[in-house]
Design a protein with these regions (language model features):
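Zn-dependent metallo-beta-lactamase
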Residues: 1-53, 60-62
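Metallo-beta-lactamase
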Residues: 2-4, 74-85, 89, 119-147
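A structural signal for short, well-ordered beta-strand segments and their strand-loop junctions
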Residues: 13, 55, 114-116
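Surface-exposed, flexible loop/turn segments at secondary-structure boundaries
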Residues: 19, 101, 122
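Residue-level marker for buried hydrophobic side chains located in beta-strands
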Residues: 54-56, 94
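Short loop/turn segments at strand-loop or loop-helix junctions that form parts
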Residues: 57-59, 119
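A generic structural signal for short coil/turn motifs at secondary-structure boundaries
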Residues: 63-67
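Active-site metal-binding motif and surrounding structural segment of the metallo-beta-lactamase
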Residues: 70-116
Length: 147
């Protein structure tokens, strides 16, 4: 039996935070211009059809913002209201990778089916997490939630 693929989708980028007080060394491990300013905006993506609402990455929430001393304008789940979507209505969540700013709001989407590459799960639960620099962008609780 063949499943019909929805042809009409709306795609939204929803900003939930920005960080202006950072340098390139905050983003890159090795960089010749490490002291230059490097502003970053934080977004989640939403794909919306008649049948499905898909969120790509869940961003980070207020607790994670406080823990990491990061600014936050609104929780990503709250940002959905700008496009008339409630977090409970999200059918699927695609996590591109398990860094805190991509997987910090997993609990906010209780009815969604989650999708993550098997290799990312293996990496985030593997021996590389013994290295401080590599594990810094991961939050153990988020990885455990995905497991």
């Amino acid at each position: 039996m063949e499943t019909a693929i929805e042809k009409n989708w709306e795609v939204y980028a929803l900003k939930y935070a920005e960080r202006v007080d950072r340098t390139r060394s905050d983003s890159f491990i090795f960089d010749d211009h490490s002291h230059q300013g490097h502003t970053i905006d934080y977004f989640i993506w939403v794909l919306k059809s008649k049948k499905d609402i898909i969120v790509v990455d869940t961003g980070y929430d207020y607790d994670e913002a406080k823990r990491r001393d990061r600014p936050i304008q609104r929780a990503p789940s709250e940002a959905l209201k700008a496009i008339n979507v409630e977090a409970n209505d999200v059918t699927d969540v695609i996590i591109t990778h398990l860094h805190y700013d991509h997987a910090g709001g997993l609990k906010d989407f209780p009815n969604a089916k989650f999708h993550l590459q098997e290799t990312e799960m293996a990496y985030a639960t593997g021996p590389c997490m013994c290295h401080e620099t590599i594990k810094m962008p991961f939050t153990g609780e988020h990885v455990c939630e995905m497991v």
